[in-house]
Curated annotation (Swiss-Prot):
Name of the featured protein: S-adenosylmethionine synthase
Highest classification ranks of the organism: Bacteria, Bacillati, Bacillota, Clostridia, Eubacteriales
NCBIfam families tied to this protein: metK
Subunit structure: Homotetramer; dimer of dimers.
CDD domains given in the database record: S-AdoMet_synt
Amino acid sequence: MKRLFTSESVTEGHPDKMCDQISDAILDAILAKDSNARVACETCTTTGLVMVMGEISTNCYVDIPKVVRETVREIGYDRAKYGFDCDTCSVMTTIDEQSADIAMGVDEALESKKGQKDEVEAVGAGDQGMMFGFATNETDAYMPLPIYMAHKLSRRLTEVRKDGTLDYLRPDGKTQVTVEYENNKPKRIDTIVISTQHGEEVSLETIEKDIKEHVINAVVPAELLDAETRYFINPTGRFVVGGPQGDSGLTGRKIIVDTYGGYGRHGGGAFSGKDSTKVDRSAAYAARWVAKNLVAAGIADKLEIQLAYAIGVAKPVSIEIETFGTGKMPEDKIVEIVEKVFDLRPGAIIRDLDLRKPIFKQTAAYGHFGRTDLDLPWERLNKIEEIKKYI
């Protein structure tokens, strides 16, 4: 049976991704000085303006406008002709402390209040909600091929812009990859869509030629392309106005790009700007860690895990496994293995994945999972042997 599946990615200059990076840059700047800070930092941007808002409880000082401007400069919006200038844009901040009612449940979990005096039990989930983790063995990164290739294309777009290979490119851009599957195995790439912001002086013909040569052919394996593969490069014909000048941006509006490209389910909670007591982030990272190690251990070819939490309670209220018919054992038995091998209380996740460190800004563009260019704790295959003891 043949089917098509599509995923998209965006470059770091996309306005929503700008906001994710700004929020995580602020988070990292605070964690570098105060590893126990509570941060929920949201950013929005539009023409000539960045606004940072949220709840932050910390004993340190961070120059937020400076962090904002440095981040925007790194992305590449450093002159007016790009539609946004890091030095002249307005930066507004409106920050409050974390709600005392929320802090009460995070500082001391329900289990701890009931006498279970354990350092890990002391940290309650920062909110209710469900989080999903996913892994598949169809790529070496244990990621679905559509999102994996879309990210590679968007990263390459940024590389050729920053290294001067295609110096007429501007920071904003999007990629999309459609993969044809046969019998649930990726067979070929059916369609590639790339939209990239550019200077006024360059022709569409030049852009099409250069993108195929320096972006697509540089990162997409030739065996995945054939004479029937379709290419849509700047299909509107012009993309000069981009970034915050073209669209407003907001933290947390690219949650499918951040995860599995729609191939796996999503609980709805965004990642960027949140410290690790927020299970939206830490439990989603843990879920990926669990799923990847289970697939690498041979328990399934494709696996999704759902975790769910209650605010102020340490232990997950539920754990569910789905193997899509690829499992080598019943799913309830896999749940039992997960409970034996992994401690999924927020305090344990923070400890085991070392999530009090300022490591988050680097994840805020090009995906939080399957990052072969980074050494992220939740991507490590360090539980395989322990899992195999129970198979």
